Amino acid sequence: MILKKEYLRERAVAYARKYALVRNPLFYTFEGIGGNCTNFVSQSVLAGSCVMNFIPIYGWFYLSSNRRAPAWTGVQFFYNFMVNNLDVGPYGSVVPIEQAQIGDVIQLQNNDDVYYHTLIITEIRDGEILICANSVDSLDRPLSTYEYKSLRVIHIEGVRYDTRYVVDCFESLYDPPLPPITPPSEQTPSNEEVPPPNGESIEEQTPSETGEEE
């Protein structure tokens, strides 16, 4: 059964503030191959929702750098998923900037009319929107300090989830346990991944195959 639940904005903000200037070892970092900003925002939204969507190609999930949905790391793909998602996972809509809330997502457009950068709102103070981002790393940076042609606000309205798979992921995301220290002689490649709950296979991708990585 598919039900709806609240998007926990404070958790998304707490995660964004913790990892704006450092990297969570659970996730690959895409700097140098397009940018890490949408990857970072996806992590933050996951912290507030704890539900991925494992539909191949069109879902929103991360298993490894080579097993992830385009929407996890691509600016336009992220937008397409969030505003069109009718299945499990977070979902939202575009709203005026005046209706923005903490935990919502902002995407910036350049002079070529391309949306190129993804940010997450962490505070609204006296009318000033503060954001966290990667590539360039920013912690509670005023939105007014960015240069852009236009922007869009993706308001996360809620989260759909399958009652068979209810997980509170926040603590394991926010403060992941350290892996055990293994002597070099005993180390083996750690490329095995847990399959998605629905059992569907996920085709491997190279980090650059999912389009714009920002």
Language-model region placement:
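Short, solvent-exposed loop/turn and secondary-structure capping segments
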Residues: 54-57, 118, 143
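Low-complexity, Gly/Ser/Thr/Pro-rich intrinsically disordered linker/tail segments
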Residues: 134, 144-214
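A broad, low-specificity signal marking well-ordered, structured residues that form hydrophobic/aromatic
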Residues: 12-14, 129, 151
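Contiguous ligand/interfacial binding patches
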Residues: 138
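Short acidic, gly/pro-rich beta-turn/loop elements at beta-sheet edges
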Residues: 129, 141-143
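Feature targets compositionally biased, intrinsically disordered low-complexity regions
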Residues: 31-33, 58, 73, 88-91, ...
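N-terminal capping segments
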Residues: 1-73
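...with weaker cross-activation on analogous glycine-rich loops/strands in unrelated enzymes
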Residues: 61-134
